[in-house]
From Swiss-Prot:
Localization (cell): Cytoplasm
Name of the protein: Probable transcriptional regulatory protein Cyan7425_4347
A molecular function GO annotation: DNA binding
GO cellular component, one term: cytosol
A single BP term in Gene Ontology: regulation of DNA-templated transcription
Entry keywords, A to Z: Cytoplasm, DNA-binding, Transcription, Transcription regulation
Taxonomic lineage of the native organism: Bacteria, Bacillati, Cyanobacteriota, Cyanophyceae, Gomontiellales
Source organism per UniProt: Cyanothece sp. (strain PCC 7425 / ATCC 29141)
A Pfam family hit: TACO1_YebC_N
Length: 254
């Protein structure tokens, strides 16, 4: 029986992983469709599309899927549901501000799904503009940590970057470089020309001020809310203005 139970657990875990992977593929494919629809369906002349394709390839999406998404966006595969980009805003437990970017072909469905997730985890979906002023949109380029930081700084100055941060990840140290959204393509182009392989180039919302969470129960519920929102099919990204310190995070995981 123990073996059977373990096999059942493994199957459930694999199903969760497969579902998560499928959701990521769908999310990235939608981004390609919208990028191709908004501009020309040629990545060489469409930076948004080029960035979406690079992100999709990094996630392991097959080339056939990518080409099909581009063709859909260009209208070459017949009638397709019109996807639109919508920004939603709301509050988590304790008044934490949350900003959600979605792509949907049904606003009513998306709003209902978001409202249900907020309500389940102690938050509420707000009106447009209720928390948007608490965030700025910036351009962010991600690369592997540079070996020569002094030379790297010179390149950043030339490219018009604002700031950068070194971040430890499971795959090693990366550098996240922040710039104005309007300068994102130029920054990515300069970095590539100077032989810094760009892992990701995207616009992102960042909180102007962060709220430090001190209550472990509030922290747990906020993280559950973020997970629930990110798991929704129509959601592309979720940004919040709270931070959890390492000590509290350790306490929460015990």
């Amino acid at each position: 029986m123990a073996g059977h139970s373990k096999w059942a657990n493994i199957k459930r875990q694999k199903a969760r992983v497969d579902a998560k992977k499928g959701a990521v593929f769908a999310r990235l494919s939608r981004a390609i469709i919208v990028a191709a629809r908004h501009g020309i369906p040629d990545p060489e002349g469409n930076f948004q599309l080029r960035s979406a394709i690079e992100k999709a390839k990094a996630a392991g999406i097959p080339n056939d899927n990518i080409e099909r998404a581009i063709a859909k966006g260009a209208g070459k595969l017949g009638a397709d549901s019109e996807l639109e980009e919508i920004r939603y805003e709301g509050y988590g437990l304790g008044g934490v501000a949350i900003l959600i970017e979605a792509m949907t072909d049904n606003r009513n469905r998306t709003a209902a799904d978001l409202r249900a997730a907020f309500n389940k985890h102690g938050g509420n979906l707000g009106e447009t503009g209720c928390v948007g002023w608490m965030f700025n949109q910036v351009g962010i380029v991600t690369i592997a940590a540079p070996a020569d930081e002094e030379a790297f700084l010179e390149v950043l100055l030339e490219a018009g970057a604002d700031t950068y941060e070194l971040i430890e990840t499971e795959e090693g140290t990366i550098a996240e470089i922040v710039t104005e959204v309007t300068n994102l393509e130029h920054l990515a182009t300069v970095l590539k020309a100077q032989h810094y392989p760009v892992r990701e180039a995207e616009s992102r919302w960042v909180a102007i001020n962060m709220v430090e969470i001190s209550d472990p129960e509030q922290g747990r519920r906020l993280l559950k809310l973020m997970d629930a929102l990110e798991d929704l099919d129509d959601v592309q990204s979720v940004t919040a203005n709270f931070a959890i310190g390492d000590n509290l995070l350790t306490e929460m995981l015990v």
